[in-house]
Amino acid sequence: MSSDYSVGGAGNNGFSKRSRFGGYSGGGSGLGLYPPTAMKRWRWWNYLAALILAFALVEAFVLLIGSSVLYTMPDQIQIDSRDFRKVEYQGLALDPTAVYKKQIQVYHVTKEFGSASMGGLGMVVTALASAQQKSRTQKVNVVMPYYSMLDKIPGIGIKLYTPLPLEIKDNRGRTQNMVFTVHKFKFAVPQKPSDFVTDKRAITPVTVWLIGPGDTYPFDRAFQSKNVQEIYSTPSGLPAEWKDLYFSKAVAAFIQHQNKNDDISLFATAVTRMIDVVHVHGATNALVLHYLQQSIDKGAMGEEPPALIYTLHDYLDELQYSNEIVNVQKFMDRRVHSEDDEEDMFLQMDGISPYCHGHRMFTSAMGIDLADAVTFVSKSMAKDIVEGRLDFYLKELVLGSVLNQAEKNLFVGITNGVDFGNLNPWTMAALREHDLSFPSNEFVGQEEQEILALQNAPAANGDDEQDTDVPAAAVGSSHSTIRSAKEAAKHFLYTNGLLTEQDLTRPLVLFVGRFQYNKGLEFFTTASTAVKENGGRLIIMGQPNNFPLRSITNLERLFKGTVTVISDAKTQDDWGVYYRAAADFLLVPSLTESFGLIAAEGLLFGSTVISSGVGGLSEFLVDRPNEADERQQLEKAEAEKERQFMPLDQRQQLEETPREERYNSYLFDPFANDSHSQLTKAIGDAITEWKRFQRRPEEHEEFLIRLVNSAKAMGWDRPGGPVDQYRALYEIALNAIGFNSQSL
């Protein structure tokens, strides 16, 4: 019998035969032998089964990946829309006769300050703290993270202050003890001769307290940063939320330590208030108030705890800030002396549950509720928020808390000031080096001239420690007018290939800001068309953000010769100040704006503002006269109501100065049905007026001086300004907790 297969065994004499499957059989080893079933051909049901199996494996893989993605995605939060009660905004009425006999201690809590300022928050807190210190009515301290980049700043003089203990929970919920260090340095406040006209006392530096990393992983990696752009980055192993929560709890532990008598144990109840006010800035630091309030409730802050102030710096991003509840629980202290962890956690959650939605806790409302007084950075917007005219995303999370404080007149708007120290067309080294700085005369620039003289005084005395940033010959300006200085800036850009010869006689419109939707970038095409039709030039200078960059860069192609887009940081750093000095107009078409610092800086550089005038912009932008404009009529009525809160001399000035002599901008309504046509008209009116000014240089110079002075009127230390208002608010908060510095 023949066979297709050979079977090895005792009777096999080494016969082998290549099988039809390409292998060999036989040889006594049994290798290469196949059972008869292995040689069957696959039928259709075999292929179907394999296909079903493969499909099942793919489905399982997709399910696994999808589950992982869904687990890491933010929880969907359902917030019911609701109607809020009507509350009339009262505002802050200053008492011009108030005399404070005690210099109070103020501690600002912030993520940014001084050289470690990445955005507007750092600029605002730095300027406010400096102005408060110069007022001499407040002894100012700043508490911030110890970013490693600070070690690279020469001459800063950071010194170790003290180590402090801190408790957190480990991954198993057990108490974990760690130690963190606090360092400090002195921040020299910029000074000018006029600071000593009415008060000869020396202006002492601001003390900056640095909260360092912990001594336990991963908190020993906190606050690592090579430069200012990295201060919000987090190293691997340390979640961003853990870093924020660690900072908040460490700050509270440090403030508790500071508010004690040095002769008393750290854990003893204090009997003397060492800190009068703790001023917390922003939602990322709001939990500081929670930890401090817990210390106050336990008596750990003594019989005289500090007043707690909370400032909201915007009404969009801050409201969205939140932490995972499981992360918050990691940094909670035990509230009861019980071994029942579930009972303890229930009591802890009971305190924060009103602020929890889904698996996240939103901190803004907590900060508002726990503070003795709350501020927003714009008076007009605070009024609109309270009285229901401003609709904003996630308002349901905070508006109830805001109204509770507003009913007690403890939610007030204090409009930010403008700091003229850094970005100043009189004193900036880059402008002085090329003789592009603005001139000083009896109308403007006298204060800056005093500063320049003070800076260069050592050079006249042969002191080797003179200002080496700018040669002594470059001090001051050869220009007799602001107009001629701006023309020189245009020519400087032309000689460096950044403007054309034609641009020297065209009005220059400048946009400065982030490329994001709420900056009104949807109006760029309309603005480009209007600028081109009126013979102008548009420079768009900003940083990429959530608005499609291609939509912006395409404008260069669509409006060749009219529009230039500058989106790289280096070009902006190298040439931005020269574009500011040369610009005739600043375009600010924002849909939302808490204050509008860019617009204020534009006025300081002699640029008329073309803007939407929304939010805080409405407080200092005055539109050209237009009797048919409903907004102007509404503003006039509002001004009549608010005169009662102004000093008498300001009321008289407002009544005596007509709009024709006050306007500094051309406004349009970004929410009107004809918003684009309004913008077109605003640009047309602005350029038409500019062309008229070219034939009347003296009138043009008067107008430029008006623009500059309207910016200078927003200084932090102006009479009745932010410094005076915050001092009055601190007094209100201190009175609320039973302390009055006027009676001391």
Regions from the language model: what does each represent?
Residues M1:
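Short, flexible loop motifs at catalytic/binding sites
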Residues D4-G9, G14-L744:
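Catalytic cores of carbohydrate-active enzymes across secretory and cytosolic contexts
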